[in-house]
Each structure stands twice: as structure tokens, then as C-alpha cells.
Amino acid sequence: MRLAFWLYEGTALHGISRITNSMKGVHTVYHAPQGDDYITATYTMLERTPDFPGLSISVVRGRDLAQGVSRLPSTLQQVDHHYSPDLTVIAPSCSTALLQEDLNQLAAHSGVPSEKLLVYALNPFRVSENEAADGLFTELVKRYAVAQEKTPTPSVNLLGFTSLGFHLRANLTSLRRMLEALGIAVNVVAPWGSGIDDLAKLPAAWLNIAPYREIGATAAAYLDETCGMPAMYEAPIGVEPTTAWLRKLLDEINRIAGQKGLSRLAMPAPRAFSLDGLSAPSGVPWFARTADMESFSNKRAFVFGDATHTVALVKFLRDELGMQIIGAGTYLERHADWVRKELDGYLPGELMVTDRFQDVAKFIDDQMPDLVCGTQMERHSCRKLDVPCMVICPPTHIENHLLGYYPFFGFDGADVIADRVYLSCKLGLEKHLIDFFGDAGLEYEESDDAAKAEPDQPVSNAHGHTESKTVSQGEPIASDEGGISWSDEAETMLKKVPFFVRKKVRKNTEDFALGIGESCVTAEVFRKAKESLGG
């Protein structure tokens, strides 16, 4: 029944295809029933790249099963003949797991050389998107990385950047710009844009950069263990974390340079990291001290997402923008302990760990924060609740796969995040001003006069008779929640409250009324509630 609802993580195939679709000369054959190759539509809709997804399906049909035959060998032959990939990854499905088919034996009967095939054997019932992607990438690194001499000059690998990654290309551009300013070359970016030959060159770099907790960190740990390659796992999101990240990177590079007897690299002037090369690298430090942003110290924020972005955004909102964090959570249970450790001292209560979007929506509805940083799921939930929301991580939609330069990494990314926080919280004022001063003919909302002009609507009762439904002008209006009624005067006063906090004010006022034993919110009760709640 869970499939009837939205899910935060995709299937194992989703994770496998994110790796193979990122790479050159790598193809995926999915052994599954017809229709399970729907994932190709996701890439063509969101990825915005000229290449068609490298994914084919080996159809499992009832007739074939009855005859005791499989289409997998012939599908592998067709893929090898038509696409000529360097590697074909064979992915199991829930159907093949139930049928207990031996994919290795079926692949061996295809006649395709074994070195060009990889059966990624996992349990599709237990493994989901991120774990499958991280596991496959690590498997490929183990298979193809070859120990070799280091590059003569400082170089790094950028690991974990995958197809459908959040602001993928912009983040890569931001990292490349900072590395270029430091005088550090990029040896390999993987899996994005890499081939089998590139994976073989991974050990030539001086160190690995794996900023995503979800994908790439396991491969970096393997290279550290087997090839003695140090790794950096921090994500440079925010001004302070980026500054610390640059210092740590330079320290690591200079330590290795010292062992090699090479000259040390120096930290360039801050303006070297700016877009124009002349100004400060980020506007966040001064922007956070402006009158507009200082008012954010009273705003309450809730953050929910994957491990990497949840940790980064909580720290950015509190440390750099001064917002109050009322809660945070992640849908990745396997990384929950790491998130708890990183956010120790940042949260007023327990970390929310759930993969049910309904639980997150209920928390938002109960707390009514001033800003939600979450996924596409939270964007939908917040739209119903009139709560400002910005998307910070997958799952995403088309507006988070942009052609323009909107990174989250580095100093440039700090500016992008600050802009989105500010605009998400402030743009609602425009609608409030229209509500308050009138629409000036824009017809933004249905006017009260039009509502009053509507004729009484006939309502059919339980016996089939028609009655006229009227509400007298002075009769209190019952609230949908809790049975508390509101007088016309109190409703008029409530309409003067900005729409983006109106629901929260209504709820708090009704709670206050119940607390003092009132069953109807009058103008006097509304004023008392306002005074009591500090309004």
C-alpha cells in the first residue's frame, strides 16, 4: 500500500541507473516486467542533457516463464551489438528475486565477454535508491581502480556526483572554481561524466573529495584503506563551512607536498573566490546584518531532507542567518546517527526520522514554522498550509534542475541559499498587501462583496427535500477545527492578519479561547488572545 503514496527514495533501480546514466560507455539492463523501465522518463524530463538514458529492459513475461526460457541472454546480445558499451550492468527486479533466477548463469549464456558484464546482485526488496547507488559506485571503484604513481602536481578526485543530483552541474562548477583559485587540478570526477578508464585513474590523485554522505563516501573510504588516499567528507555549504573546508583542503595538500619535497600552496586573497575576482566572495556576512535580515532572528525554521543537506541547512540558518530551529529530520534512517551527532546542540528536541511524508506534514501543520526547508514533498504540503517552503534536496521537480548557475556549494552557493531563504519568507508580503489594501482590479482573490452577492444555495437533506441554506449576518461562524465559533467582527479582524500566519493565529486564538472557557471567539476574546500571545 505504500506505493499508493509518495516516497522519498526511489527503488534500487533508480539508484543503479543514477550511477550508470552518469557514466560514459556504461549501460544498464533491467530484468523486469514490461513497464518497469518508467525511470527513463524521469531522466528525459529532468536531466536536460542531450543523451538518451542508457537503460534497456529485459522483459519478464508469463509465457516465457511457463516455457522455462528467459529473454535476458538475447537482450544482452542486442545491447552489446547496438550500443557497444564498455560495461553492461545487469540489475535485478523484485520479480526476478521472487522467481529466484540466477542472473549470473543467464548472463554467461549470452556470449558477451564476462569482463563487459557486471551482475549487481542486491535484494531489491530491502535496498533503496541511495544505498543501491552508493553500493554500485563502490563496486565499480573496486573493480577498476588501479594503484599507480601520483600526479606530479596537486590534484583531487570529486566523488559522488551523479545523474539527477541536486544542483549537480552548478555545484561542480563552484568546486572547480575554488580548486582553480587554489592551484589544485581535478584528476577525475566520478561517476558523473567518467568512463571505465577514468575510474582506473582514481588512485593517481593526491586526495578524494566526497561531500555527499549518501553517495561516494564509501568509495572514498575504500580508496583510503587500499591506496592510502586521504579523503575529505565535509560539504562546503555556507560561508563558514566553505572557509573551513578551504583551510582543511590546503592543509592536506601541503602536508602531502611536504612529504614529496614540493613547495607549499598559499591561500589566495578572498576576492580570488568571487565571481568577478574583485569583490568579497559572498554577500551573506553583510546581508545577514541588514535590517531586513536581522528580523529573521525571530523566525522559526524546520528542516527535513537527506543527511547532507539537512545538516548543512540547519547550521546555515542558525549560525549565519540567526534563525530559530524548531526541529529537523531526515528520511534516511541509515544516516540518522551521523545527523544526530552533527546537529548536537542545534535542535530543541529529538531528530525526526521517518520516510512517511504524512508525519512531516503533520509536524508542519502543528508547529506552523515561518520557513520550511525540505523536499518536493514538503513543497506540496506547505502549499496547502500557506507556509513558505524552499527545496534543499531530492526528491525534486523540474524547477530544481536548472540550466542556469545556482549552486549550493561554496561562497556562490551561500548567496543562492540566502536569496532563496529571503525570497521564500518575504514574497508572501505581496499577497498580504493586496489582501490588506485591495486588489486594485487585479481580482487576486474573490472579494467579500461578490461572496455576499451569491444567492443562497439549495441543499438537499437526508430525505431528498430541498432546503435553503442561509447564515444570518450576526450569527457566529463555526470553525472547521475544534468546534469553536467566530463572530463576524472577529473574522474581520482575523482577515487583517497576513495570510501566511493567519492559520497559525486562528489556531492559537482558538486554543486561548478554550483555555479561558469560551466557545465563541469574539472581538474581545481576539484582543485578549493577541495581548496574551505577545501580538
Curated annotation (Swiss-Prot):
Record-linked Pfam families: Oxidored_nitro, PCP_red
Membrane-spanning intervals of the chain: none
Reaction equation(s) it catalyzes: chlorophyllide a + oxidized 2[4Fe-4S]-[ferredoxin] + 2 ADP + 2 phosphate = protochlorophyllide a + reduced 2[4Fe-4S]-[ferredoxin] + 2 ATP + 2 H2O
Any GO BP annotation: photosynthesis, dark reaction
Alphabetical list of InterPro entries matching this protein: ChlB/BchB/BchZ, LI-POR_suB-like_C, Nase/OxRdtase_comp1, P-CP_red_C, Protochl_reductB, Protochlorophyllide_Rdtase
Oligomeric form and interacting partners: Protochlorophyllide reductase is composed of three subunits; BchL, BchN and BchB. Forms a heterotetramer of two BchB and two BchN subunits.
Protein name: Light-independent protochlorophyllide reductase subunit B
Species whose genome carries this gene: Chlorobium phaeobacteroides (strain DSM 266 / SMG 266 / 2430)
